[in-house]
A protein has these predicted regions:
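Conserved ATP-binding loop and adjacent catalytic segment of the adenylate-forming AMP-binding
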Residues: 15, 89-94, 112-171
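Membrane-proximal helix-turn-helix segments that form the acceptor-binding/catalytic region
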Residues: 99-113
């Protein structure tokens, strides 16, 4: 509820999906900028993308996995720790972001993505790494539904965050 109030306060449109089986269709129709989702949703995205990659021809498959590795190296090894990104890594990343990552996001209906709050249970480290490699701005947190209070979260902008945690307590 608190998320809805925040969105309404900022003039955002709110879409409510009543049927979990129709989530892919709903996302492709609405093309959200922001979306709250539980880790299970992102696990299915992770599995679905990997399933499609595995069905690709050999060279394309290798290119996709290389692109993900470059995204991981840039976003998790350098940007997350506020380190300077090597020129070759940055160039490759920018090319992959405009081509392959953009294509994956468009296929998912998430090409307009700004950030995605995620809570409800633990988001696995491998899924979080994958999403951040593709330039999804994940905001992973913990809070009590009963009190609508987020007590901790991390954002990629918070340097040095541990992907196995839900961040630091909010003040």
């Amino acid at each position: 509820r608190a998320w809805d109030y925040l969105c309404m306060n900022r003039g955002a449109m709110i879409y409510v999906n009543k049927d979990p089986k129709e989530i892919q269709t709903a996302i492709k129709e609405t093309r959200p900028n922001m979306m709250c989702a539980v880790p299970r949703f992102w696990e299915k995205v992770y599995a679905g993308v990997h399933e499609k990659i595995e069905k690709m021809p050999g060279l394309v498959k290798k290119l996709m996995y290389h692109a993900i590795a470059v995204g991981k190296k840039r976003n998790l090894d350098y940007v997350r720790f506020n380190k300077s990104v090597p020129f070759s890594t940055e160039i490759q990343y920018k090319i992959f972001k405009k081509t392959l990552f953009a294509k994956v996001k468009k296929e998912l209906g998430l090409e307009n993505s700004m950030y995605f709050p995620c809570a409800g249970s633990q988001l696995s480290e491998s899924v979080c790494e994958f999403l951040m490699s593709l330039d999804f701005n994940m905001v992973v947190g913990y809070g009590l539904t009963e009190s609508t209070a987020t007590v901790s979260c991390f954002q990629p902008a918070h340097k040095h965050h541990d992907l196995k945690s839900v961040g630091e307590g909010m003040q």
